[in-house]
Curated annotation (Swiss-Prot):
CC annotations in GO: extracellular region
Domain of life, source organism: Eukaryota
Gene Ontology MF annotations: toxin activity
Modification Serine amide occurs at: 20
Organism: Cupiennius salei (American wandering spider)
Subcellular location(s) per record: Secreted
Keywords noted in UniProt: Amidation, Secreted, Toxin
Keyword ATP-binding part of the UniProt annotation: no
Main location: secreted
Expression sites by tissue: Expressed by the venom gland.
Record protein name field: Short cationic peptide-6a
Keyword DNA-binding: no
Length: 20
């Protein structure tokens, strides 16, 4: 598992919720 990919995934999820 790539931690960097995981961080990007979490960031995108968070950004999505913030934009909603």
């Amino acid at each position: 598992l790539n931690p960097f990919r995981w961080v990007i995934n979490k960031y995108r999820e968070w950004k999505n919720k913030k934009d909603s």
